[in-house]
Amino acid sequence: MRVKVTLACTECKRRNYNTMKNKKNDPDRLEMNKYCPHCHKHAAHKETK
């Protein structure tokens, strides 16, 4: 089952991206390196509630 998740920057804590994930394949929280427009750099983004 695919669900919507929100990704938040680990440095400034702002929620920048929405994406979908498959809970069966990724039961843990996602973490991706993406560009943060508020920090003006690439930073790790973690899945939030």
UniProtKB/Swiss-Prot annotation:
Keywords: Ribonucleoprotein, Ribosomal protein
GO BP annotations, alphabetical order: translation
SUPFAM superfamilies xref list: Zn-binding ribosomal proteins
Origin: domain of life: Bacteria
Oxidoreductase is among the record's keywords: no
GO molecular function, one term: structural constituent of ribosome
GO cellular component annotations of the record: cytoplasm; ribonucleoprotein complex; ribosome
Pfam families registered for this protein in UniProt: Ribosomal_L33
Similarity section: Belongs to the bacterial ribosomal protein bL33 family.
NCBIfam families from the UniProt entry: PRK00504.1, PRK00595.1, rpmG_bact
Name of the protein: Large ribosomal subunit protein bL33
Lineage, opening ranks: Bacteria, Bacillati, Bacillota, Clostridia, Eubacteriales
